[in-house]
Amino acid sequence: MEKVDIFKDIAERTGGDIYFGVVGAVRTGKSTFIKKFMELVVIPNIENESDRQRAQDELPQSAAGRTIMTTEPKFVPNQAVSIEVDEGLEVNIRLVDCVGYTVPGAKGYEDENGPRMINTPWYEEPIPFHEAAEIGTRKVIQEHSTIGVVITTDGTIGEIPRRDYIEAEERVVNELKEVGKPFIMIINTVQPYHPDTEQLRQSLSEEYDIPVIAMSVESLRETDVYNVLREALFEFPVLEVNVNLPSWVMVLNEGHWLRQSYQEAVQETVKDIKRLRDVDRVVWQFSQYEFIDRASLAGIDMGQGVAEIDLYAPDELYDQILKEVVGVEIRGKDHLLKLMLDLSHAKIEYDQVADALRMVKQTGYGVAAPALADMSLDEPEIIRHGSRFGVKLKAVAPSIHMIKVDVESTFEPIIGTEKQSEELVRYLMQDFEDDPLSIWNSDIFGRSLSSIVREGIQAKLSLMPENARYKLKETLERIINEGSGGLIAIIL
């Protein structure tokens, strides 16, 4: 990621105002970090000569030893400066140097009268040093910063050992987490690549769940600054996560078990995404589901806080669902092609009566209009009307008429006493409330109730005589072709 992209993305997330709140314990190198940051990134990009000189004059002072140098909060520069990072891309930058949390061994936060009193921009009266550190940290991050930077150390930069910084370090991190702004941690060390430093970096990152970078602030380079910005960018919240399911899964009905499983997995997993940094971890979590072969990050828009994730299903799952949908096991490509041909033929036939079927279900009567291919045209015939002549064109086309008829089937077994009948009713109704359809599976005299009823309905359907069917067809033809609206039916 180039520096222009980093600044552009951060500017989008912060509204163009990149304000760093630099916090931490005393004697960790906060002022040195601000000074180096300004000299490397900000001051060289200030076009106005007077603004550049003013920013140079307002750089904080830093020195080695145990004596505290920053005794009051300081804005660097005092007024935010606008720098042009690239053509058409201007950002406002300002850093805030906070009063550090006190640590054992540091000098300068007490005088002969007790705790040293500090002047702050937030109170007219001076307040004690430790109070200025706590209030200043919260106010700087909450009101004057878009990004927080916690500076700590492994103890190699001065005379104060690492153990003396731990309590102050924990207080700062907890304070920042309460505020809720994105922040990162820098370990200021003279040995950034030493195994012990790397071990400390990893342990702090795991303990605080934030990005931790080990570097020598005194030897800060421009690439280090952009690394800090890049890591800070990943701490911004995710505003939108788009998860793309396999295309063939999206074809399934919303109520299908597999599609529901995917949707539940997405809902369960993406709820853990809060920061851009969480996206990679969530992508890995998706891969743990048995119905997801793999997941990949399709793209991430740092500036907009939008992530896009692609999910892929196992090939064997596709075969399983295909078998489930088609109803038969697919034995190979030839078998699949034959099934597709059969289904294609069936679909052509079904499409001709689909509207009629829908009508008959809704109203009890449906008509399937004939297709052009079904029409037969008789030979044109000359006709005469008085002194005038014309041509008679006659076409015949079959139309399919569907009538919904409710067929009743009654089953009345005579089994004995009234008590025995009551027991049969209880037996039939025992699971009816939980599963009404279960009554059809009830066993009556060695047969299921469904088979008995089905047999009764089938018997009634076959009772309609052949000549009655023909007469019914003939009657419909006359009504339609002759336009008769009246019908008298006599059933013998």
UniProtKB/Swiss-Prot annotation:
Keywords annotated in UniProt: ATP-binding, Cytoplasm, Hydrolase, Nucleotide-binding, Sporulation
Positions with a binding annotation for ATP: 24-31
Primary site of residence: cytoplasm
Catalytic activities: ATP + H2O = ADP + phosphate + H(+)
Highest taxon of source: Bacteria
Molecular function, one GO term: ATP hydrolysis activity
E.C. number: 3.6.1.-
GO terms for biological process, alphabetical: exosporium assembly; spore wall assembly; sporulation resulting in formation of a cellular spore
Consequences of knocking out this gene: Defective in formation of mature forespores. Fails to progress beyond very early stages of sporulation. Forespores lack the germ cell wall or cortex and the mother cells are filled with swirls of electron-dense material.
Gene3D superfamilies assigned: P-loop containing nucleotide triphosphate hydrolases
Gene Ontology cellular-component annotations: cytoplasm; endospore-forming forespore; spore wall
Localisation: Cytoplasm
Motif Walker A motif in this chain: 24-31
Disulfide bonds: none
Record NCBIfam families: spore_IV_A
Function text: ATPase. Has a role at an early stage in the morphogenesis of the spore coat outer layers. Directs the assembly of the coat and exosporium to an area around the forespore.
Name assigned to this protein: Stage IV sporulation protein A
